[in-house]
Amino acid sequence: MAELGAGSLLTGDPAFNYQEHELNERLKRLYPAVNEEETPLPRSWSPKDKYSYIGLSQNNLRVHYKGHGKNHKDAASVRATHPIPAACGIYYFEVKIVSKGRDGYMGIGLSAQGVNMNRLPGWDKHSYGYHGDDGHSFCSSGTGQPYGPTFTTGDVIGCCVNLINNTCFYTKNGHSLGVAFTDLPPNLYPTVGLQTPGEIVDANFGQQPFVFDIEDYMSEWRAKIHSMIARFPIGERLGDWQAVLQNMVSSYLVHHGYCATAMAFARATETMIQEDQTSIKNRQRIQKLVLAGRVGEAIDATQQLYPGLLEHNPNLLFMLKCRQFVEMVNGTDSEVRCFSVRSPKSQDSYPGSPNMSPRHGATNPHLHSTGADSPTCSNGVTPPNKNKSHNKYTGISSASSSPSSSPSSVNYSESNSTDSTKSQPHSATSNQETSDSEMEIEAEHYSNGVTESSTRIMNGTYKHQEILQADDNSVDDTCSSRQLCGGNQAATERMIQFGRELQTLSEQLCRQYGKNATHKKMLQDAFSLLAYSDPWNCPVGQQLDPMQREAICSALNSAILESQNLPKQPPLMLALGQATECVQLMARVRSGSCSFARVDNFLH
């Protein structure tokens, strides 16, 4: 980041650090659209951009005059560390007159980079100032214009720059004095100038609450911008706009698998859904498996329902396998959980018929047997007549046995019993809607001490707290008892074997496609979990956070959609992304209204 000035440096002083924290919070609240990595805010006066007669102290916030002060040639000014970012929309700072000195020849205002610092602000081109001795405003000229009252010791003078209409007004002791300057150029710096001995001023760039209620003024302009957006003329295109918006909402619901909601929305708006209901449910259930940490089952389901998808997406396959290894460490993947979890015979497994998907058969080209000497566990997705299936990436495997040995399995048969067609009309039956809640992720007690509550997922949504988090009441008691692979020796051996297969897959992909730094880091991070006695509390332990499943879940869902010639991202999200980029572009071209046109202000 660019120079922030002494006013932003942390020290060992707790009081100073508290003030710095307060400053950061206040600036974020006042200027939420500003990205300080790109355009830092002024936080102090610059020790490098001042005339020699200026002295700085108190973290470069206090300015005192140290020249002779005989005439105007002894004037001296200092600029802030950075110019005012356009993304502020409205920017404000205050200066307190600690001492008016001998004559009170002080100027407060703005100037561009390169303006002579041996002058008071306002006397030169691209320089603007309000002077205390006569109350005049100076706009790039040595001749001032009557503006406001004089100011002296104890007064607080504020300077507000409106980057929306490019004007500036001043305040005195919390009261606005009216507009002083118009048609201001961009990239102006807060500036203060002194001319006679004894003059001392303190700046407040947000270190303390302002005397003037700048937030109320900002609220007025925020309301103006929002009203302008709301009144944007649509005219005769209203019908077209409504149709576009309805399609965007519908595609968003379909993309994320909210099947019943999508069907209800289609009926209400008399629109069509561009994906058959069975396909939506298949994607929904695969996502649920990933979010529940049952990645092996999700891989098998994907291979059965969408043959060839992972074979043609080796990067995605590798990501999934690395995540499966992490879930093995966590004790949540079926490959290791079956060693320590006993459940009643499964009554719902994938059917062995090609009817499991309207578009795909039941073949499983990616599965590869682990061999007779290795323990095998069902992921609950292998058809009874297909225990083994090979793919070209022979270094990795998904062990399978009879579905009856599955610790938990998923019913796909009901949702596929309805013969759905593409572009379903809005008259879909209620029976199709209610099947959204068919799948349950059963209550299972893992031997690592983490209990997952029964999670019934309704209407395409999941109970985030239940799927992604352990029972709050048991976390404190069980964190210390969590063990690798649930503490089961056979499960640990299976995990190690899987790790070897994963290493083999990595080497095979490297030979076939060349080195991949992302794959290398992914594998190293996953394997690094084994270097710690408590993987959940180690430098790479964030991988075990259930929230980490969401990225791979999204990637898999997008790949499935893309394989069916559907958008891999919902148009609604693309539109939001484009709007966000446009607002950021407005900031780069110094359009101040971007500050009050942020996309998240319109999301409810």
Swiss-Prot record:
It comes from the Eukaryota. GO terms for cellular component: cytoplasm. SMART domains: CRA, CTLH, SPRY. Gene3D superfamilies: 2.60.120.920. Pfam families: CTLH (PF10607), SPRY (PF00622). One of its GO terms (biological process) is cytoskeleton organization. The gene is ranbp10. InterPro entries: B30.2/SPRY (IPR001870), B30.2/SPRY_sf (IPR043136), ConA-like_dom_sf (IPR013320), CRA_dom (IPR013144), CTLH/CRA (IPR024964), CTLH_C (IPR006595), LisH (IPR006594), SPRY_dom (IPR003877). Residues 343-356, 371-396, 421-434 have a biased composition (Polar residues). Residues 279-336 form the CTLH domain. This is Ran-binding protein 10. It comes from Danio rerio.
